[in-house]
Amino acid sequence: MCSPIYMAMTQIGKFTLHNGGGFVARGEVAYLDDNGEKHLSGNAGDILLGQTKDVDPSKLGVPDGTIISLYVFVVWGTDNEARQSYIYKQGSSVTANYTITGTTLSNTLGLISVG
């Protein structure tokens, strides 16, 4: 009999997104509700080339305690979603920092650090 392996998910309070690409990006939060259905929050506003902005779930209507990931809406391009997921803990100072680079149709979203 195999015993299940449980991995502890990191709790975070927000994301930051740095735009290193030649396009306008908008940070959003993808989250799972109690039924396991995926939703997208509103966006945190335009992030222009060279800018870094917070993507704060508490300001985007994301329920505390849900499983979240960073979703980036790329204006006139291909959206991107982070491969990493976290548990949202409202008020936590822990931040997952990301950068997006490339072009509208060929971009890469990368995790820089969590802390």
Residues of each region from the PLM?
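Intrinsically disordered, low-complexity segments enriched in small/polar residues
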Residues: 2-115
